[in-house]
Amino acid sequence: MATSKILLYYAFTPLSDPKAVQLWQRELCESLNLRGRILISTHGINGTVGGDIDDCKAYIKKTREYPGFNRMQFKWSEGGAEDFPKLSVKVRDEIVAFGAPDELKVDENGVVGGGVHLKPQQVNELVEARGDEVVFFDGRNAMEAQIGKFKDAVVPDVETTHDFIAEIESGKYDDLKDKPVVTYCTGGIRCEILSSLMINRGFKEVYQIDGGIVRYGEQFGNKGLWEGSLYVFDKRMHMEFGEDYKEVGHCIHCDTPTNKFEHCLNEDDCRELVLMCPDCFANVETRHCKRERCAAIAADFAEQGIDPLVTS
């Protein structure tokens, strides 16, 4: 039986013709039956693809033949092509949408002026040496942090990466500008950019974790400074670094520990992802995001004895 895997990767390198790279990558993935999402810009490439393990290996080999991608690191994860609805390869102004394409500078070595890279062991060593002075700064959307984060991390109030510039310019975090700040995100790419944006705005000692949460979790599992589950952007929705993980998220209705995000049942104008335990999700009356309109719709379904999951 064939073994499937998911690849996560990115590279910051100048690309003079992103459209040509797009066409090449699409043809390569289609020839190998890979599915997933790839973004390309003049700053580089950002991708997550899944498929048969041998096809993934062939993809790595072929992609590294491109001069700008020859040192690109690939992270392996559980899953496969079935975790993605299709293959999407697009050209964008940014490979991560911070809304600052003209501010970001890259050369053949990566992002210019970004935070100092720390390997997972060096993160622990920094905390051991500097103690509570070290601040972990979450570079993801606030929703992702609901099910897992570094211990005592600062979690900015952002819904998308586009919100980060306004958030760090708000003054809320000015007291961190003279402290050692360790930015972190899923695989590292968001912090390549975020750390440079923070340095440009007066943060003096900024770090980023090589390989992000994924690499840290692979090395230390649940025995290090990471707590909970890792949110991922595919059908799995979350992953853990061993069976002994701690559930840090809580159901919005009954406060039961859970790491499961579910969609609000209001399909017409909501569908928000919220944390719900299995019991509250199974109950039509509580299968909502707690907004007044959505709660009323859920109550109406319950009163009529209708379950949208059964009738749809």
UniProtKB/Swiss-Prot annotation:
InterPro entries: Rhodanese-like_dom, Rhodanese-like_dom_sf, Rhodanese_C, TrhO, TRHO_N. SMART domains: RHOD. This is tRNA uridine(34) hydroxylase. One of its GO terms (biological process) is tRNA modification. Residues 130-225 form the Rhodanese domain. Belongs to the TrhO family. Transmembrane segments: none annotated. It comes from Corynebacterium glutamicum (strain ATCC 13032 / DSM 20300 / JCM 1318 / BCRC 11384 / CCUG 27702 / LMG 3730 / NBRC 12168 / NCIMB 10025 / NRRL B-2784 / 534). It catalyses: uridine(34) in tRNA + AH2 + O2 = 5-hydroxyuridine(34) in tRNA + A + H2O. Its EC number is 1.14.-.-. The keyword Cytoplasm does not apply. It holds the Pfam family Rhodanese_C. Keywords: Oxidoreductase, tRNA processing. The active site is at C185. One of its GO terms (molecular function) is oxidoreductase activity, acting on paired donors, with incorporation or reduction of molecular oxygen. Catalyzes oxygen-dependent 5-hydroxyuridine (ho5U) modification at position 34 in tRNAs.
